[in-house]
């Protein structure tokens, strides 16, 4: 058993965490050719259906240097091609209610505990405004459109507000008047609420774990990691696909990142947003430097090794962190991305994203859910 002390938590307390020591890891080969061969063998194992162990994933985290990380990315891209194909899932989001959030997530500028500078504050948008943006997203090439709201979630909202029913009605309008698929990210929901969303037409729901179970208490104290897991399980019970990922660059360790990916694998989520922290002024994490581009690529590649068939989605921070190198993520395991603007920050024009995909020989559309692509290719082979 080992003991270490986390930095200050969301509640301002110091937490001593007890963890079992990880198994000893064999360092990856240092010779370039040996590393390339080793990664080819490992990636083929994953393609053949093996699961990467935590020890193996931690070994991948030891790969350093830009050239070696690019070799890791190439191996992850082989897994993506074999398990997911070349269609990149495109979605867009709308912030339907913003600011004054009761939760104290240290990365978020919408929290009432530390309202970020220039963070918008407004109540629930009208169905007409949301529908208009859904239609615009469809024209821009998005296949899914997610309604995102601040707050802990409908599970804790007053029924008298009527907001949940208004969301359900807006979802029905979107399914009736467009061909885009509506998703939601409203926070925690009960099983009954998840079933109501499913009946209204929601097929996928975003509810991120944000970080590993061990690191979560360092960034949020107003609710628990287990609360978020409970909502993911409610969604799956209701027959809604779980779009569940996290944020890289909040001060977490490589082991935290590996643990998050393994938790997502155990939950059997369908889509995994990979957010790259874009530090916002006025938030407790606003002082952090942006994640190194090659650390971001390494994280993406390791997630692909651990989640070979899941939809891995470029999400918030893509442009801000990756800059002109963002196309490398699409050759490192990514097979989905948000297009258009984010919740409180701007994205690049959708036409730029389409041009980037075309230049890489990829096609925007709707990516297969886990297992679907391999089933299709196996049928064709027979």
Curated annotation (Swiss-Prot):
Keyword Metal-binding listed: yes
SUPFAM superfamilies: Radical SAM enzymes
Keyword Calcium: no
Listed GO biological process terms: biotin biosynthetic process
Reactions it catalyzes: (4R,5S)-dethiobiotin + (sulfur carrier)-SH + 2 reduced [2Fe-2S]-[ferredoxin] + 2 S-adenosyl-L-methionine = (sulfur carrier)-H + biotin + 2 5'-deoxyadenosine + 2 L-methionine + 2 oxidized [2Fe-2S]-[ferredoxin]
Residues engaged in binding [4Fe-4S] cluster: 101, 105, 108
Cofactors that this protein relies on: [4Fe-4S] cluster; [2Fe-2S] cluster
Gene3D superfamilies assigned to the protein according to its UniProt record, in alphabetical order: Aldolase class I
Binding-site positions, [2Fe-2S] cluster: 146, 183, 243, 313
PROSITE patterns: RADICAL_SAM
Protein keywords: 2Fe-2S, 4Fe-4S, Biotin biosynthesis, Iron, Iron-sulfur, Metal-binding, S-adenosyl-L-methionine, Transferase
Pathway: Cofactor biosynthesis; biotin biosynthesis; biotin from 7,8-diaminononanoate: step 2/2
GO molecular function: 2 iron, 2 sulfur cluster binding; 4 iron, 4 sulfur cluster binding; biotin synthase activity; iron ion binding
EC number: 2.8.1.6
Textual note on the cofactor: Binds 1 [4Fe-4S] cluster. The cluster is coordinated with 3 cysteines and an exchangeable S-adenosyl-L-methionine.
Highest taxon listed in the record's lineage: Bacteria
NCBIfam families recorded: bioB
Subunit comment: Homodimer.
HAMAP family: BioB
Family: Belongs to the radical SAM superfamily. Biotin synthase family.
Name this protein carries in UniProt: Biotin synthase
Taxonomic classification: Bacteria, Bacillati, Cyanobacteriota, Cyanophyceae, Oscillatoriophycideae
Gene name of the encoded protein: bioB
């Amino acid at each position: 058993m080992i003991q270490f002390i986390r930095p200050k938590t969301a509640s301002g307390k110091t937490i001593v965490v007890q963890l079992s020591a990880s198994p000893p890891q064999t360092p990856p080969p240092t010779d370039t050719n040996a590393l390339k061969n080793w990664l080819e063998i490992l990636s083929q194992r994953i393609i053949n259906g093996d699961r990467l162990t935590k020890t193996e994933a931690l070994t991948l985290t030891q790969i350093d240097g830009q050239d070696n990380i690019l070799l890791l990315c190439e191996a992850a891209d082989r897994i993506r091609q074999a398990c997911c194909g070349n269609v990149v899932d495109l979605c867009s989001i709308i912030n339907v209610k913003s600011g004054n959030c009761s939760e104290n997530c240290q990365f978020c500028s919408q929290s009432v505990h530390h309202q970020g500078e220039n963070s918008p504050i407004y109540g629930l948008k009208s169905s007409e405004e949301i529908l208009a943006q859904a239609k615009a997203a469809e024209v821009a090439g998005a296949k899914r459109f997610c309604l995102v709201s601040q707050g802990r979630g409908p599970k804790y909202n007053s029924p008298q507000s009527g907001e949940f029913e208004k969301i359900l009605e807006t979802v029905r309008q979107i399914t009736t008047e467009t061909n885009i698929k509506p998703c939601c990210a409203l926070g925690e929901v009960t099983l009954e609420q998840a079933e109501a969303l499913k009946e209204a037409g929601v097929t996928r729901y975003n509810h991120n774990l944000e970080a590993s179970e061990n690191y979560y208490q360092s960034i949020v104290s107003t609710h628990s990691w287990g609360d978020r897991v409970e909502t993911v399980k409610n969604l799956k019970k209701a027959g809604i696909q779980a779009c569940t990922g996290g944020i890289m660059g909040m001060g977490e360790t490589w082991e935290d990142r590996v643990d998050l990916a393994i938790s997502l694998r155990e939950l059997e989520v369908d889509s995994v947003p990979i957010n790259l922290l874009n530090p916002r002024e006025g938030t407790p994490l606003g002082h952090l430097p942006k994640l190194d581009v090659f650390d971001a690529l390494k994280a993406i590649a390791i997630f692909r090794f651990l989640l070979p068939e899941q939809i891995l989605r470029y999400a918030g921070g893509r442009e801000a962190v990756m800059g002109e190198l963002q196309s490398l993520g699409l050759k490192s395991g990514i097979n989905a991305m948000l297009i258009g603007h984010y919740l409180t920050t701007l994205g690049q024009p959708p036409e730029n994203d389409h041009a980037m995909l075309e230049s890489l020989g990829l096609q925007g559309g709707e990516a297969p859910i886990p297992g679907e692509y391999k089933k299709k290719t196996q049928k064709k082979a027979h």
